[in-house]
């Protein structure tokens, strides 16, 4: 057999070989570092035997997929340690994730002392160095095995698998888990790890299920890499919008209001209004027409669109179909409403494209276990829009939507922080979608070609499309590495028929338009969270809730400070005066901690000369300036939405 390696070189063998044997044949160093193999694109155990021609990549912890295998094994060591120390704990699931791993247990919550004890037990298990072995059982035997061990969550997972399935297990010493793998050869491969936290999580993410206790951890190939990661985690905690956004009085949450329903505080409202005005102005420049549509509709509307069949579980339904004459639902999106704006009058081919935009409030019934700060909420605001176009206009208009999204990202200073994804349908799960394979394949091909023509790197994600069409998702990671979708642009060749939308062509015949579903900037709440974490609260001046703080050096200069404040406000600058009887150093520090970009210090000399002493987060002490000079510069900075570089590091503390 011939094994083709990642670098294109080939190895020829007369008999079957395991992945680890081939790794040793390449180099002993590679074999010692190996975590798994990738055979024809599938990640497998190192013990997997290869008996035919294939492509092989030996994965180490330097590879994302190899590191995931190491972390998956670490999660099994964690579960073994927990059940050693807490024998009554029931195990649920324990996958690797982007930043490490977790394992869910049915048991009381863990304290930090508990986590420290579990870490010690994990080190004992690793020191013993048990080999990891894979074996299989029939579905019936697997169920019986876990029933005997009183592990109900494992039983439920197996019962969800088809009858006749072969069920794989992994054992390390005297501890065994249900698992598809792959795993390391031995627990000794888990050399550097840390348990980070414990929290609650619903079984399978649904609040209808049992509340479990989750332990998060991370693992790396070396202690140096682990140390670097833990330092990054400390910085992430400092930037976490869920903490910083509350400290900056941008938003808060209240138990009696409910999860996923944040209160946007005055500072947050200022920022959202700035973003909204800017987005609406940019859309107006590009020919968008504003609409304002209802927050809810009868179920009839969603039955026409297909949302009732494909998305009902994600909607807030008001009423009972069996007992009520009319059932309503809060809208999860704006599209079917804007279709009726279009249908309210007849349109010629000359009228198209029509670009409808709306700053919409939407509602989605997310599981409470998914709620997090401003990134995952049940009510949110979005810059939504729908373009009704002729088929021959589709490519240009779609590219223009991408260009608008890229412009918005560039202005916000986050264009380098995103990834692009072509979200496709899953042809093996056709019941999730409307339309036939030909339409789906054609539209996906169009989007693929556009992204290539625009030189945009992208990945293709099967099964991530909306039920009515493929889309471009522009994603970003939060400070903890979790990826969220920020902006979506969708190609829809199907819903116009569902709603009997048409235009009159040059021959007087009715024709179906195409539809582009898009956002310019996406969800405002999620964007706020993104910006808080990106800038650690030190936003570009145009977005700052407070742009200038006037600080008189003593009470006798309060009147002059008030005059300066009045002039600033007349020029549209958001400002305040600190009239407290505190030391100047304290006032300056307080303004800095409040992340105010500019402080204007006023005293005898400033009042006498009609000037202000400028202190900025960017350059520190900028000296004394005429107020008009300062006004000109800050107004220009705000108008241009300039992102100034912070030159003085102590101002950033």
Can you describe what each PLM-predicted range is?
Residues 1-90, 97-653:
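NTP/phosphate- and nucleic-acid-binding module
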